[in-house]
Regions:
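Conserved catalytic core of the tyrosine transesterase superfamily
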Residues: 1-214
Length: 214
């Protein structure tokens, strides 16, 4: 059986991602055929607010050479544009990002169930990745991990989750959201933007079964 999401056609399949339309446009209505609990993902207005606040904090942090605001900005951007699980985020290293290929991607070495997969990146996010990698290399060159603490050590899952809670507070958003909501948000917008292509969502999120995606 021919797979809906074939690797040969990935460039065309991800045109919508390249245009960065996932979070720029508000959906025409709030109905999703894919059943998702609305308390578990951010709508486009909340995404816009969160990104704006964190981008401003990041720009200030870069000038003052502070790691935490810049790291938190990239944490949220990565979650929104890749849908990675929190354990996948904390284990991500600089060499796992492939930004010189025609279609940029990142490699998840050990995802859920110890499975590996490739996640494709929108062109606009590639620029953000390059910016963060270059800045981190200048600031903490000794660590390959993308998410590090002030001492340069690998950040834990718990620490990343706490950082996200602080991001919510900074943006004035409801505190009930967990960092996993970034994954739900990515999946929801990807589903809408891909004309309800569940197979594509399954591939990107790394679900072993399409029933999990549903």
């Amino acid at each position: 059986m021919r797979r809906d999401f074939d690797r040969q056609g990935k460039q065309k399949k991800f045109t919508f991602l390249m245009k960065d339309e996932l979070f720029r446009k508000k959906p025409k209505n709030n109905h999703f055929s894919w059943s998702v609990d609305e308390t578990k993902f951010l709508d486009s207005e909340k995404v816009k607010r969160l990104r704006k606040v964190l981008t401003s904090a990041k720009d200030k942090a870069i000038k003052e050479n502070k790691i935490v605001p810049a790291r938190n900005w990239f944490m949220v951007e990565l979650g929104l544009f890749t849908g990675l699980r929190v354990e996948e985020m904390v284990n991500l290293k600089a060499p796992d990002l492939h930004l010189k290929e025609e279609q940029s991607s990142l490699s998840v070495k050990k995802g859920k169930g110890d499975k590996s997969r490739t996640v494709y990146l929108p062109e606009t996010f590639k620029k953000e990745c390059l910016f963060y990698l270059n800045w981190k290399e200048r600031t903490f060159p000794r660590s390959d991990y993308l998410f590090i603490n002030r001492a340069g050590g690998q950040l834990t899952k718990r620490a990343l989750q706490k950082s996200f809670k602080r991001c919510l507070k900074l943006a004035g958003l409801e505190p009930h959201y967990s960092i996993h909501c970034l994954r739900h948000t990515y999946g929801s917008f990807l589903y809408k933007s891909s004309n309800h292509n569940l197979r594509m969502v399954q591939e990107q999120l790394g679900h072993s079964s399409i029933r999990t995606t549903q």
